[in-house]
Amino acid sequence: MADLHLAKSITLRCGLTLPNRLAKTAIAESIAPRNMLIDEGFHRVYAPWAEGGWGMVLTGHVQVDSMHLGTHTDPAVNADFSDDQIVGSWKVWAAVCNRHGTPTIMQLNHPGRQAPIGAGTSGVFAKNISASAVPMDIGSGLLARAVSKIVFGTPREMTVDDIGKLVRQFARAARLASQSGFAGVELHASHGYLLAQFLSAATNRRKDAYGGTPANRARIVVEIIKAVRAEVPASFCVGIILTAVHGSASTEEFQSFIEQAQLICDAGVDFIEISGGTFETPSMFIGPEKRGKAYDWDNQEAFFLDFAQAIRPHLGTVPLLLTGGFRSCHAMEAAVKRGDCDMIGLARPAVVNPLLPKTVVFNPEVNKSGDTKLHATRTPAPWYIKLFGITALNVHMDNAWYVGRLQTLAKTGR
């Protein structure tokens, strides 16, 4: 298996060397206690991933602001605790992750307008925050519109002071992660969360220095990267996850992405991960539609491979991590061998088998042909759920199997 491109090590710009090209990418664990710190449940979940032979493990998102959570069970930088208390909690987590030498990266996030009512300490009457006051659109039916209004509401546009506070929150969280023993952080600017809301012209309608042009919309992300770099050692890894956009290389949306990605590269990131989708259009779970047709699960994989191929020449030497839909060793090896991406990210298959690299991909007794399939469970929503007309609800019913698996592991250790 040593001749596989997937098995080759890679050294990131910060100097961090990953032993191979397989990354266990982020999936929300949904197991945090009410104090939002890390408990033994996280240790039980991450122990198998730590010994699984991954080149890199990315944690599920940790929210930088305890007032706003993506779910009621997200871990966060809790404002009620001191830096020492948070580091004390995170250090044990990092020690579990580092037990077998696997580089572990903490994903940092803020949900913005995708925070459901009551998630976090802001209170049920407080508005969500976003780049602009653009409400969620989770469906065209009356029920979908009602759910959107009740669960998410219309966010308020962030002030410049709010933006400065957010930059400091990301920088502080990164510093605490570094002090706790993590190898780096990944900034979450995908899946419709707050940083993605700033990057997108659809959700950022600001008229000030943080809106309008693609560069202005990326300004907050660039400022966060620079602020994080100022707080952590040069050897600390700083990555980012961005959203694949639709359309050909000639479209304005694609060109805007390239301009923003180049600014982000110049600001000093060590890798870029590509995924896709939002709560409104969750293509990270179901695959992107092509020409109006649903994703063909039987004959296609690698949801965002075409997009990765299109952007790869524009990213210079910054390594590209591609996540979403890979379900065979052959497809993963081919993507890296061709140079479409530098690393492959797996989330759902990593929940099914936390030891996947060791027991399957790099195991010559199992992966003899080089085209072994990866297992992932799909659980379509019942017909009566589909009647609600809320795509995200249908998809998250499918995702519930994986959440349940992690919750069971957190409780029992198996």
Swiss-Prot record:
Top enzyme class: oxidoreductase
UniProt EC number: 1.-.-.-
Superkingdom of the organism of origin: Eukaryota
InterPro entries noted in UniProt: Aldolase_TIM, NADH_flavin_oxidoreductase, OxRdtase_FMN_N
GO BP terms: ilicicolin H biosynthetic process
Segments passing through the bilayer: none
Protein name from the UniProt record: NADH-dependent flavin oxidoreductase iccE
Family: Belongs to the NADH:flavin oxidoreductase/NADH oxidase family.
SUPFAM superfamilies: FMN-linked oxidoreductases (SSF51395)
Catalytic activity of the protein: 8-epi-ilicicolin H = ilicicolin H
Residues annotated as binding FMN: T25, A26, I27, A28, Q107, A347, R348
Single GO MF annotation: oxidoreductase activity
Pathway connected to this protein: Mycotoxin biosynthesis
Binding site for substrate: H188, A189, S190, H191
Annotated keywords: Flavoprotein, FMN, NADP, Oxidoreductase
Job description of the protein: NADH-dependent flavin oxidoreductase; part of the gene cluster that mediates the biosynthesis of ilicicolin H, a 4-hydroxy-2-pyridonealkaloid that has potent and broad antifungal activities by inhibiting the mitochondrial respiration chain. IccE acts as an epimerase and catalyzes the conversion of 8-epi-ilicicolin H into the final product ilicicolin H. The biosynthesis of ilicicolin H starts with formation of the tetramic acid by the hybrid PKS-NRPS synthetase iccA with the partnering trans-enoyl reductase iccB since iccA lacks a designated enoylreductase (ER) domain.
